[in-house]
Amino acid sequence: MPLVVQKYGGSSLATPELIKSVAARIAAKQSNGKVVATVSAMGNSTDDLLELASGISNRPDPRELDVLLSTGELQSCALVSMALKALGMKAVSLSGAQAGIRTTASHGRAKIAGLDPARIEEELDRGNIVVVAGFQGITDEMDVTTLGRGASDLTAVALAASLKADRCEIYTDVDGIYTADPRLVPKARRLNEIGFEEMLELASYGAKMNPRSIEFGMVYNVPILVASSFEDLPGTLIHEGADMNYSVGEMRNRVRGIATEKNVAKITVYSVVDRPGIAAALFEPLADADISVDIIVQNAGVSGSTDLTFTVAASDLDRSMEVVDKVAIDLGTDKVGRSAGLAKVSIVGTGMQDAPGYASRMFSALSEGGINIEMITTSEIRITCIVEEDKVGVAARVLHDAFELEKED
């Protein structure tokens, strides 16, 4: 009998009526096989809980904050199970811990360390629809953890991999993956399918998907459908082998999508004596402070000195500066610059690795749009530019036009 893992986001569960609608969709799916449903917190519940915590403390204890935030998904979990039972279905709700999700002890951004699906399998064998709280797990010391914002997607894909499900279906307030953010680019087009490699790059650089969920799907080969919970539309299928299935239209430009991400900040450490170990001396303390560094550029200066520039999330800028100011002294400089109000804009496509001219085409389009490029980074299938945040919408539109992404495949 087929097994499907579904995930429903907070916007799909924001009211009792929406929860009833989701329950009806889950119940209909069970007529064709077994169903496990992963749920996010209702609507803006997580933000409300964060606001409650901030009313108690400016810096809430991470362990206790995880205990608090995990209750949002538990509410949804219980309510969806109640709604299913009201429809006459057999259903059971499980917390992340009850579902066997074991994590590291990094509160607020824990990683899945293991998953024992025995309890879920027992409930499925009893004929139950299993509703699992997303976003959470438990450590070996039995402490509740959360996996980071948006990680209910990861919970769903991890469960699908562990249960060897036929596929994972992620239902949200959008009807699939688009060639760009439709809020920025009105001409953006929904993709019928996309490969894991391209989707991972898009998600990592701003597309509305949890990058770790895509990575999990790629490693364990779990097909992922992204579709609307409000409309009966086909959505976008993310799966292995989609990357190179180029149609005539795709061969025309080989760029599959534009990703954008706001709230980026830049830090530059100037005039560092160029010697072995300076990069490690700077970035190891940042890693120890649990600060993620993205783009790194090293520029050779004069008289044996170098400038190191890197980007972080704007929310991490102040903490980063605390670390960098201390390290800079050890590196023999007191010249540290910072810039906020930046954004990333990227073009992504597996076909770019085999064809020249994409960088120049991108840079020309941005130049013609009056957009200054502050930093550049690339992978085999992606080119990313750092631009001013208030120009990111224009950047996305001119690139979408330059690569003719509005045209059907």
Predicted regions: what they are:
Residues 1-214, 218, 311, 387-388, ...:
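Nucleotide/pyrophosphate-binding catalytic subdomain
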Residues 42, 174-176, 220-224, 228-233, ...:
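Glycine-rich beta-alpha junction loops
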Residues 89, 165, 222, 291, ...:
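Short glycine/serine/threonine/alanine-rich loop segments
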Residues 133, 202-263:
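Phosphate/diphosphate-binding glycine-rich loops and adjacent basic-rich segments that engage nucleotide
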Residues 168, 214, 221-223, 323-326:
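N-terminal short leaders/motifs
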Residues 237-409:
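A conserved regulatory-domain signal marking ACT and ACT-like small-molecule sensing domains
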